[in-house]
From Swiss-Prot:
Protein source organism: Fervidobacterium nodosum (strain ATCC 35602 / DSM 5306 / Rt17-B1)
This protein's name: Small ribosomal subunit protein uS8
Cellular component aspect of the GO annotation: ribonucleoprotein complex; ribosome
Described function: One of the primary rRNA binding proteins, it binds directly to 16S rRNA central domain where it helps coordinate assembly of the platform of the 30S subunit.
This protein's record includes keyword Electron transport: no
Length: 134
């Protein structure tokens, strides 16, 4: 049986976003924290808190929406897992993908940590493309 914790996290965020949930709980890991940091920095989620549960911990992610409670609009329009356990996708520094012509971001795991596509281009590094978000 295969398991993909990153795909699970992205799916939980996507599902919570579809039904306008205020928050969603995800089992924690260092990679998931790095991804959540990028989502906060880029304005896709309000924030997250780490909750110690005696095991691996939980990330409680606060979702972000535009507009009033009655006329809400989603901030995250799409979220896609790119590199999967069965098929890893790597890019060099010259082939970093643009998401929705620059309106979205690509999350890339590099030797300098987990970065957005713009940050990876600035640092001049490539790596494994984790996800696209727009």
């Amino acid at each position: 049986m295969w398991s993909d914790p990153i795909a699970d996290m992205l799916t939980r965020i996507r599902n919570a976003n579809q039904v306008f949930k205020e928050q969603v709980d995800v089992p924690a890991s260092n990679l998931k924290k790095a991804i959540a940091d990028i989502l906060v920095r880029e304005g896709f989620i309000k924030g997250y808190t780490y909750i110690e549960d005696g095991k691996q911990g939980i990330l409680r992610i606060q979702m972000k929406y535009k507009g009033t409670r009655k006329n809400r609009e989603r901030v995250i329009h799409g979220i896609v897992r790119v590199s999967k356990p069965g098929r890893r996708i790597y890019v060099g520094k010259n082939n970093i993908p643009r998401v929705k012509n620059g309106l979205g971001i690509a999350i890339i795991s590099t030797s300098k940590g987990v970065l957005t596509d713009k940050e990876a281009a600035e640092h001049g590094v490539g790596g494994e493309v984790i996800a696209y978000i727009w």
